């Protein structure tokens, strides 16, 4: 069984809630998902819901409340206790910080410092029995500061690509089928910059599969 462990920030929920829902509902017996929800994530989503009337944030909070549903058999969710942040020293974060990085970690606002604390806790301090945790974020600044502190991070698209393959997702199967058809009907060549390209005959054009339905017309 393959296991994936993700720390999820607010931007991942707000911009990729549909993807996260699909991961949970499509999770097969061959894949186990562990989600860690930091205090930062809950506070940010609550702020976006209350102050900016974000529909995505509101739906994300509702979804998080339902994640302990028994129908998500291969999913484990860990909601961070705020008290955890009090036991993590800032020096623990700075120990992993690359001082040559672009971001002055010491001058970050407290909420971002708390996110770093949560990530350092899961990645390095907690007894994880060999588990490797990855931060999912759609915020370039957060991914940059995570990289500077040696915290593995990725985007929704990155995770989607990996999980679609492991869960044998329909979109992955169709994409793989399309790629195989391209290889069959084309010729592999190498471009001037060293990239591999597939050259096809116009008369053997292959179109990617589309969903069923009627073509809309005005």
Curated annotation (Swiss-Prot):
<dbReference type="GO" id="GO:0005737">
    <property type="term" value="C:cytoplasm"/>
</dbReference>
<protein>
    <recommendedName>
        <fullName>Nonsense-mediated decay protein 4</fullName>
    </recommendedName>
</protein>
<dbReference type="InterPro" id="IPR002716">
    <property type="entry name" value="PIN_dom"/>
</dbReference>
<keyword id="KW-0963">Cytoplasm</keyword>
<dbReference type="GO" id="GO:0000184">
    <property type="term" value="P:nuclear-transcribed mRNA catabolic process, nonsense-mediated decay"/>
</dbReference>
<keyword id="KW-0866">Nonsense-mediated mRNA decay</keyword>
<comment type="function">
    <text>Involved in nonsense-mediated decay of mRNAs containing premature stop codons.</text>
</comment>
<dbReference type="GO" id="GO:0005634">
    <property type="term" value="C:nucleus"/>
</dbReference>
């Amino acid at each position: 069984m393959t296991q994936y462990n993700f720390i999820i920030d607010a931007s991942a929920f707000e911009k990729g809630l549909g993807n996260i829902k699909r991961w949970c509902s499509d999770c097969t017996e061959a894949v186990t998902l562990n989600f860690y929800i930091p205090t930062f994530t809950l506070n940010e989503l609550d702020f976006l819901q209350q102050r900016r009337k974000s529909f995505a944030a509101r739906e994300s909070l509702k979804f998080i409340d339902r994640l302990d549903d028994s129908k998500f058999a291969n999913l484990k969710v860990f909601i961070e206790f705020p008290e955890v942040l009090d036991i993590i020293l800032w020096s623990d974060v700075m120990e992993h910080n690359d001082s040559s990085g672009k971001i002055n970690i010491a001058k970050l606002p407290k909420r971002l410092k708390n996110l770093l604390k949560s990530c350092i806790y899961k990645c390095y301090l907690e007894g994880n029995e060999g588990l490797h945790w990855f931060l999912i974020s759609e915020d370039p600044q957060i991914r940059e500061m995570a990289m500077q502190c040696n915290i593995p991070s990725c985007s929704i698209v990155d995770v989607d690509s990996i999980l679609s393959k492991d869960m044998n997702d329909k979109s992955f199967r169709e994409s793989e089928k399309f790629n195989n058809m391209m290889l069959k009907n084309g010729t592999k060549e190498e471009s001037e910059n060293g990239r591999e390209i597939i050259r096809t005959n116009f008369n053997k054009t292959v179109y990617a599969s589309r969903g069923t339905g009627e073509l809309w017309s005005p």
